Amino acid sequence: MTHLRKSHPLIKIINHSFIDLPTPSNISAWWNFGSLLGICLMMQIITGLFLAMHYTADTTTAFSSVTHICRDVNYGWLIRYLHANGASMFFILIYLHIGRGVYYGSYTFSETWNIGVVLLLAVMATAFMGYVLPWGQMSFWGATVITNLLSAIPYIGPTLVEWIWGGFSVDKATLTRFFAFHFIFPFIIVALVMTHLLFLHETGSNNPSGLNSDSDKIPFHPYYTIKDIMGFMFMGFTALLLVLFSPDLLGDPDNYTPANPLNTPPHIKPEWYFLFAYAILRSIPNKLGGVMALLASILILALFPILHLSKQRSMTFRPISQCLLWVLAANLVILTWIGGQPVEHPYIMIGQLASITYFLTILILMPLASLMENKILKW
């Protein structure tokens, strides 16, 4: 008799995805981030659901309702800070996951990679809308500044902005719709994640060598389930460390002041995980140019499969490309730092140089390095 997990229509899908899945025997801890992101997404949906039970999406009571959650709801402070810091954890894991994909050439699975880019955009949109909900100063002004960027679109821009606002400024209508979208988006993300996995399981996982691993596969369970559990423990420990000891470390103090349309904060800036893109946006003096650069900074990921000119898939045996990838990583750290600084000398110049370096490295230097390595290896 066939085992139930191999015959039952529903359990069979889970079996082929997480139990009997043939997996390369040499994948490293860098392959843990996918499952960690899955757990993180589940945590965000659960904590978010409990927060939504007590939150009111109204400009007069939104700020008070968040305060009420922290003060009066049983373990409300824990749920709120798990949700806020969970977003930071999510982005740390996403950036590491993307970095792994770039280093090991996982972007050659173009369908999986492109769905991943769509996922990144969806997660960024969700995080932005979530940041508006507590209705603090930075929530309000962040929403005003970022939505206002759409007015740079020729002809339809101003109308589009007012349509998104639901009026002539960020107000009650904006908050209500942002709450509605923030609630529904994670479920769209879950659907996208399933598509992401569907396409990944069509080809099988990549591995550190970048070579075909069909001849050496092992079942996902128990080898990688136990390895993933170690990742969960590390992530859980880090999240609790953050939530219980310094929950406001990554937040903005301005968001503890209720939103006031008559008083602009001295430095309007988004959460830390958007700062690199914000720095690129600010480094271009023209509004439309800045918006285009902002979009390009994320959408450039979709070009990786085209820009891959090396005869090898992974960077494991390509030291020049490795150096450039670390230059790119350092450059992103610099952009993140600049995004949080005021718009004054010397930060403007550093931001502009870092923005140029970002695009130059990806579009020109890395493909050139690949060609050079091919030449050196006489391939």
UniProtKB/Swiss-Prot annotation:
It is found in: Mitochondrion inner membrane. Its cofactor is heme b. Heme b b562 binds at residues 83, 182. Binds 2 heme b groups non-covalently. Its main location: mitochondrion. The chain crosses the membrane at residues 33-53, 77-98, 113-133, 178-198, 226-246, 288-308, 320-340, 347-367. A ubiquinone binds at residue 201. GO terms for molecular function: metal ion binding; ubiquinol-cytochrome-c reductase activity. It is a multi-pass membrane protein. PROSITE patterns: CYTB_CTER, CYTB_NTER. GO terms for cellular component: mitochondrial inner membrane; respiratory chain complex III. The keyword Glycosyltransferase does not apply. Heme b b566 binds at residues 97, 196. Keywords: Electron transport, Heme, Iron, Membrane, Metal-binding, Mitochondrion, Mitochondrion inner membrane, Respiratory chain, Transmembrane, Transmembrane helix, Transport, Ubiquinone. One of its GO terms (biological process) is mitochondrial electron transport, ubiquinol to cytochrome c. It comes from the Eukaryota. The keyword Metal-binding applies. CDD domains: cytochrome_b_C, Cytochrome_b_N. Pfam families: Cytochrom_B_C, Cytochrome_B. Component of the ubiquinol-cytochrome c reductase complex (complex III or cytochrome b-c1 complex) that is part of the mitochondrial respiratory chain. The b-c1 complex mediates electron transfer from ubiquinol to cytochrome c. Contributes to the generation of a proton gradient across the mitochondrial membrane that is then used for ATP synthesis. Belongs to the cytochrome b family. The cytochrome bc1 complex contains 11 subunits: 3 respiratory subunits (MT-CYB, CYC1 and UQCRFS1), 2 core proteins (UQCRC1 and UQCRC2) and 6 low-molecular weight proteins (UQCRH/QCR6, UQCRB/QCR7, UQCRQ/QCR8, UQCR10/QCR9, UQCR11/QCR10 and a cleavage product of UQCRFS1). This cytochrome bc1 complex then forms a dimer. Heme 1 (or BL or b562) is low-potential and absorbs at about 562 nm, and heme 2 (or BH or b566) is high-potential and absorbs at about 566 nm. This is Cytochrome b. It comes from Myoprocta acouchy. The gene is MT-CYB.
